[in-house]
Amino acid sequence: MIIVTGGAGFIGSNIVQGLNDRGITDILVVDDLRDGRKCLNLADADIRDYMDMDDFLARIQTGEDLGRVEAVFHEGACSSTTEWDGRFVMRVNYEYTKALLAWCTQRKIPLIYASSASVYGMGPTFREAREFEQPLNMYAYSKFLFDCHLRAQQGIESQVVGLRYFNVYGPREQHKGSMASVAYHFNNQLNESGRVRLFEGSDGYGPGEQRRDFIHVDDVVAVNLWLFDNPQVSGIYNLGTGRAQSFNDVARAAIKWFRAQGEDGGRERGGIDYIPFPDHLKGRYQSFTEADMGALRAAGYDRPFMDVETGVPAYLSWLASQDKR
């Protein structure tokens, strides 16, 4: 059996699909389905069982044996960067992951967990070392502190990998609302008004020229499954493309896709409106991120990553296919 926590969420449900593509269906999904819309992410997936997050945590804290477990993909977390209830965030992100680490290492079960590029704060260096880490919100701090906890462990004999996700976009993120990717929001904006809204310049960048390392979720899944295939690899690794691209690049890729749809597609769609940069984000907004991918490449992962010119059209085509169902 393989356990996927957060398995009804964005990245978790895509990992489930990736496992299904390999013919693997002996999967236990762990999640919090108070937002029942997330079940739609699993409607076309095959799994063996579901367990509520709180029930799962209680069982691993008491050391319950859940049978033969091949690996745990831990994607479950409070991922909102605007959540300031520190007790809640630390319980869900930090204490939960600590308990899962102890449970897995005691049983020598491989654990591949989601960290975050947010641990680097404003950057400008995005490399897996303490000197470059300066979290700016509770979410980032909870991820950072667990990475520190892992670094302090001695004598772990099984695989443990933390993946610092950069800006992930792609299918099955619609439940995330305001926390969904800009590609998702641009799709909605172009459908509604034919225009994309971007922030004006900030931190020395021109309008829409703030740059992020945007990575398609299919590439994220590919790395997770490669790690599953290579249990000798452990450590904390960045997971982006290694190339920063601007929000304008994402907008242009979306506009180009809409314009290519023909008569009912994007003839009238394609404007970009630049809106004032919000005061509440000043000093808290990453205007530039770019993963240093040296560590993961050195570990042996050599596949190419999609750029936004490839990944965004693929994603918008998927969204359009969902609208027609």
From Swiss-Prot:
- Family named by the database record: Belongs to the NAD(P)-dependent epimerase/dehydratase family. HldD subfamily.
The free-text cofactor remark is:
Binds 1 NADP(+) per subunit.
EC class of the enzyme, as a word: isomerase
User: Tell me, how does this one assemble?
Assistant: Homopentamer.
Active site location = Y139, K176
Q: Which gene encodes it?
A: hldD
Which keywords fit this entry according to its UniProt record? Carbohydrate metabolism, Isomerase, NADP
Q: Which InterPro entries match?
A: Epimerase_deHydtase, Heptose_epim, NAD(P)-bd_dom_sf
Q: Name what cofactor the protein needs.
A: NADP(+)
Swiss-Prot/TrEMBL GO biological process terms: ADP-L-glycero-beta-D-manno-heptose biosynthetic process; carbohydrate metabolic process
Q: What name does the UniProt record give this protein? A: ADP-L-glycero-D-manno-heptose-6-epimerase
Entry-linked Gene3D superfamilies:
NAD(P)-binding Rossmann-like Domain, UDP-galactose 4-epimerase, domain 1
What function does this protein fulfil?
Catalyzes the interconversion between ADP-D-glycero-beta-D-manno-heptose and ADP-L-glycero-beta-D-manno-heptose via an epimerization at carbon 6 of the heptose.
Q: Which SUPFAM superfamilies match?
A: NAD(P)-binding Rossmann-fold domains
Q: What is known of its domains?
A: Contains a large N-terminal NADP-binding domain, and a smaller C-terminal substrate-binding domain.
In terms of Pfam families, this protein maps to: Epimerase
What's its catalytic activity? Answer: ADP-D-glycero-beta-D-manno-heptose = ADP-L-glycero-beta-D-manno-heptose
Detail which positions bind substrate: N167, S178, H185, F199, E200, G201, S202, R212, Y285
Chain positions recorded as NADP(+) binding sites = F10, I11, D31, D32, K38, E75, G76, A77, C78, S79, K143, V168, K176
Give the range the annotation lists for the signal sequence. Answer: none
Q: In which pathway does it act?
A: Nucleotide-sugar biosynthesis; ADP-L-glycero-beta-D-manno-heptose biosynthesis; ADP-L-glycero-beta-D-manno-heptose from D-glycero-beta-D-manno-heptose 7-phosphate: step 4/4
This protein's source sits in the domain of life called Bacteria
Q: State whether keyword Isomerase applies.
A: yes
In Gene Ontology terms, what is one molecular function of this protein?
Answer: ADP-glyceromanno-heptose 6-epimerase activity
Q: What is its EC number?
A: 5.1.3.20
